Structure formats: C-alpha cells, structure tokens
Amino acid sequence: MAKQFKRKSNGVSENNRKRGRQELRKVTRTAARKQQDESHEDGLDVNNNFEEDNAEEEIDEEEVGEQDYDDRGKAYSALLTLLKSEHKEKSKNVTSGSLQVDRTNPSDSEDEEIAGANVEEDENEGEDENVDENGIDSESDNEDEDTVNRLSTDPFESHFNLPTEDYLAKEEKLVLKDNEKWCTVDKRTYSDLAVTSLVQLPPGEPINPPLLKSSKLNEYTIKKRVLDSYQQAYGAELTDLESTLINPILNYRDVNFQYKSFKNKSYRKLYTLHALNHIFKTRDRILKNTAKLHAAKEDSEELELRDQGFTRSKVLIMLPTRDSCYEVVEQLIKLSGTEQQENKKKFNDQFYVKAAPPANKPDDFRDAFKGNNSDFFCIGLKFTRKSLKLYSSFYSSDIILASPIGLSMILENPDKKKRQYDFLSSIEVLIVDRCNQIEMQNWDHVNTVMKYVNKVPKEFHDADFSRIRMWSINDQAKLLRQTLVFCEYLTPSINNLISSKSHNLSGKVKFKPIINSENSMMNSIGLKIKQIFQRFDSQSPLQDPDARYKYFINAILPSLLKTSSYEDGIMIFIPSYFDYLRVKNYLKTSTKFTFGSIDEYSSQSKLTKTRQEFASGKIKLLLYTERLHYFRRYEISGVKTLIMYGLPSNPLFYKELIRFIGKSVFKEECDLDLALVKILFSKWDAVNLEKMVGNERAPVLCNSMNELYEFR
C-alpha cells in the first residue's frame, strides 16, 4: 500500500515540530508574525477554545482565531520529513460546551500532518481499470457508437474530444501569446433571482457546446447513475436559480458565482454532480476505447484513440476547512451511487467533529468555524463501479480535495527532490468553494497552487503516450480546463481567478447579485447615524495604497480631534495589514496620540488589556484590523467615532462596525447625533462601495465632482 505521512519526532524539539507548518502560513502573508512566547491561551487559535473567563465576558470576549505561532527559524524547517513518513491516524477530543480539536501535543497530533496526503504511487491501484468489457456501466449500451450527433450534443465530447490540433494552436496564439481581449457577448438580468450574468468568449473562434437550458435535469447529458442518485435525493425539477447555474457548469464554461449568504448551499450539489458526471464519463470513455483497441488488435487493425491525460486525477476541489471537505465528500458519496466506501471511519475520525462556536456569535461566523475547522488537509478519492476509496494515492485518484495551504506544502517542499506536483498536470475541472474564507486564511497559497495546475509533469508515471490527448502533450490543457469559483462576495483576488488565471475556450460566465439602495448593507444597519464618505484622488490601483496613506496622514489625522465630538472612543478600522503597520508606525513616531493597536497576531493578553483600556477611556484611539475581526468577531466597547481607512471586503463587517457605536449609544456613553462614521475611498473601490451603498449610488460617489457625501 502507498505510504501515508506523519511527522518524525526523533531528534526534533517541540518548537521545531510546529515551526514548518506555522511559518509556511506566515511567510507569504502580508507581514511577518510577531514572535510570541506567551502561553497557549495567548495565541490567536481558530481551532481551540471559544470559551471566556468571567472578566472577559464583561466586554464580550469570545475566543476564536488562529493558532499561536512561533516565528523562529527558517520557513518550512520542520517539514522536510513530511513526504517520507508514515501517517498516524489520530482522533479528535470533543469537550462539551466548546470547540475542542485536540492540539495539546502538536508533536503527536494528526492535526500537524496534512490529513489524507498520499503522493506515492501504488502499482496495484490501477488494476480495476484494466480492460473489462463487463465493467462499463449498463447505461453505456446506448452510447457505443460515437455518432456525429452524440459528439456534438454532449458537452463533454465537444469540449475535450472534438477540438483539433490546428484549432488549439491558433487559439493558443490569440489567448496566451498575443493576449487578445475577450469579448462580452451577452448580459442578462434575472429580476426574479436578483442576479445578473455576463458571458465572455475568447478571441477567435470559441468552442460552441450545446446550450440547453431546462428546469429538468434529465434533459441534460448526465450519467445515469449520477442522475438517478440526484433525482432520488432532490427530485427531478430544478429551481430557477439551479437551472440558470447548471447550464454553464455542464457546458464546461468557467463560472464565477456569488451566493450572497452562507445559507445558499444549493450550488454545491450542482458542482458535485458535475464533478462525478465528468469522472464517470472519462472512465467510461477510457474503458470503451480500451475494448475497441483490443478488438482492433485481434483484427490486426491500427487505431489511435486518445482519451487520457498524463495522470489520472481530473478534478481538484479547494476548500477552507476539514469540515467543509467533510460536507463535500458526503455529497459526493450521496450522488455517486457507490455501495461501499473504503476508509470511511478513518475519514470521519480525521474530518468530522460535532462542535460549534458559541450561540451568541453571528450565524455566518458559526457556519465558518463549526466542526473541524483545521485548514490543513489534502485527500484523494478514487471511484470504481461500485465503490469509493478515500485516501487513495494522488496518482490513482479521480478527485482531489485540499486546502490551499495543505496542497502548497506538497507542491513547494524546500527540498526540490521531494517536490510533488505531477498529479495536478491533468486537472480538467478546478473548483474553488468558499473563497472568502480561503482569502482570510491566506490567498497566496491559492496563487501557489495555480502555478502548478496543468503544468507538464517532470516524470510521466508509466503513462501510455498513445492514449494521451495531444492538447495535453502540447501543454494546452489550460485552454480546456474549466474553473468554477464560488464566493459570498467578490474581491479583486477572487475575480482574478476567472479574469486572468483562466483561459477556457468555452468561455466565462460571471454571476453578480443585484444590490440596490434598498437591499444594500447601509440600509440594513438600523441606526440613523451620520456616515460621511470621503473620496481621495488615486491615479491607479498600484498607487492607491500610497495615495490613501498620504491623504490620511495629511487630511484626516490633523483634523481628527476637531471633527470628532469626542476626544476618546476613536476607532480606526484598517482592512490591510500592510496599511495597518504603516499607520501604526506613523502614530508612534510622528504624533502624540494616546493609542492602542490590536491585530490578528496580537497575544490574547494584549487583546484583552487593550480593549479594556480603550473601553475605559485610558486609550483614546484604537487601531483594529479586518482579519482580527474575521477571526474573533469582537463587539468593541467604547466606540464613539469610527474611521474606516478603507471599506471592509465583507459587507457584513460594515454593519457590525457601525453597531459598535450603537452599543455605546445604548449604554448612554455617547449621543447618536454626535457620533460619526467616516469612510475613505477612491474610484478603485467601486466594487466594495457597491456592496455598501448599492449600484445606483456607487457610480455617483466614484465619478461625480463632489468628493464628500453624507448619509444617515
């Protein structure tokens, strides 16, 4: 059997054991983590205790965050043994009343491993795919003939098997080398769904799959075993949103879909259905062609049938936590129709924890951090006719599910001889779900993974070159790879996955929620508080951070005490950690403000002390970062004036931050008419601005002559 991984312990200190994974997290983040030598409770640990002591309850202290990190040593220094060690399975300890993923002994805990990682090849794992004419699904009897009609009406065939070498060479030049502009060919508004769609096609001649749109799933070309399982679980009829979304997904177009709320989960059953449909069609195509080749060999005929990539893995699904992976795997099991799941108990032990954050946290927070919220996993799934194998070798897997950090640790091992990335060479469907959670963890790891997807392998792993498609051999797989991106709200980094990192010749479809003044976040605050939007000039997105900083220190800070009705209770919210460090340094060296600062890397003792001093008025001004708010969701006491250095990426945070002032008003610590919210923005903030004020107001604020706007 293929070996699994665990961390070696001989001769390695406890600090060194933890260092590799921890420093990988921080080395590409926006700034280096401060060294922390405090005890366990001083760390920002998402996975550990949510409970509070009595003193902290008075200021709404609930603990969620990232693990306490040790900064000493070189990045990755303790990870050199990962790719040659045995994996040791560990169970989780669940303590009633709080979320407890057992990390009390990092050297022994499976949480310090990449759960599911298995990159070694097993020669026996491919035996079930040998020629077996009886192994083809029963539904295939009606698909034996590759008629022109079938090839042209099945998106799988028209997308992956019909494009010619000449066509792909021509499109490669236009799309990748000349970088010609994509054309917008269709814009639609679905008023009943409060959604708009935008369709973009590549330059030249796009692949034209059959564009069927139906509310009945059985009218699409879906494998019978998947279709039957889906209809048994969810019925034959699709909702309006599902029928709108399933069309571009099944037609192998790239999709960027904003689901608006964590409660909207129906899209997940659609992409799992699509992933299984793709896997089973690929498998059946290979088995049929193998049977044809055997028959031709007996008749002394020569056939060229190309139906494979360099490696077996065809679908990659990136997710933020083990709990989210558990949910997707359960969905795959439900729709696959498999009668047996190998290693299911082991999977449940490593990926499932029945626990949740406290009930007084926001619902979206409870959803994000429920269950096993470790962001450290990478697991392969292999499907056969009647069974599913979990923890299959990556080179024998059909689907790989991974967190970006877990996958990047395999892709970029500091020892170049131990790096593994060939198993991503033949990915044909890439799915990135819950992108906003991943972005708050560390988006750099997504960029790392994207560098290796569809990269020509350094070794060929016994591949049969007579069966490999020419577009794989010619390094053109990226032109046919489908990318599906699902997020709650759009950010520039997430948008770039489709806009600049995807080159799918079938085109791209971007779905966008309609946000007007009525359903904008500003309209849901529930407080008649003065909100001033202040625009500053910025020549380009690259120059925007410098322009924002100069405007802040020259125009906002000098008049801060004059414009505020209160000399204390001033909070400055800063989304970017880079900007936070810059402003913090300026306040420390160039002003006489009595200020405090807390961020996602602050120790627990500092977080508690600073918040208490700010609430009591001892500290007049407080710097507060977006990632700290994401991981903790504090309700800061004592806020009377709120300055937003930039708009939060999550629109919910806008409402929560302003309600800090509402809390002070309720406690009669300030007057609602005297409280103030001021927001800095530039024309490059249009996407974020639209989420706050609506699509009618945002263009006015960005482009009109006035630079200052007041709302209540």
Swiss-Prot record:
Task: State its location(s).
Answer: Nucleus, Nucleolus
UniProt feature, compositional bias: Basic and acidic residues: 15-26, 34-43
Reading the lineage from the top rank, the first entry is Eukaryota
Matches recorded under InterPro entries = P-loop_NTPase, UTP25, UTP25_C, UTP25_NTPase-like
Tell me which GO cellular component terms the UniProt record holds.
nucleolus; small-subunit processome
Q: Which UniProt keywords apply?
A: Nucleus, Ribonucleoprotein, Ribosome biogenesis, rRNA processing
**Record flagged with keyword Nucleus:** yes
Checking Gene3D superfamilies in the record gives: P-loop containing nucleotide triphosphate hydrolases
Entry's Gene Ontology molecular function annotations: rRNA binding; U3 snoRNA binding
Q: Which stretches are tagged as biased composition: Acidic residues?
A: 50-69, 108-146
* This protein's record includes keyword Chaperone: no
Sections of the chain in a coiled coil = none
Q: Where is the composition biased (Polar residues)?
A: 93-107
Question: One Pfam family this chain carries?
Answer: Utp25_C
Looking at the record, which segments are called Disordered? Answer: 1-72, 85-159
Q: Give the stretches traversing the membrane.
A: none
Family classification: Belongs to the UTP25 family.
Share what the entry says about its subunit structure, partners included. Component of the ribosomal small subunit (SSU) processome composed of at least 40 protein subunits and snoRNA U3.
Function of the molecule:
DEAD-box RNA helicase-like protein required for pre-18S rRNA processing, specifically at sites A0, A1, and A2.
Q: What is this protein called?
A: U3 small nucleolar RNA-associated protein 25
Organism encoding this protein: Candida dubliniensis (strain CD36 / ATCC MYA-646 / CBS 7987 / NCPF 3949 / NRRL Y-17841)
Organism taxonomic ancestry: Eukaryota, Fungi, Dikarya, Ascomycota, Saccharomycotina
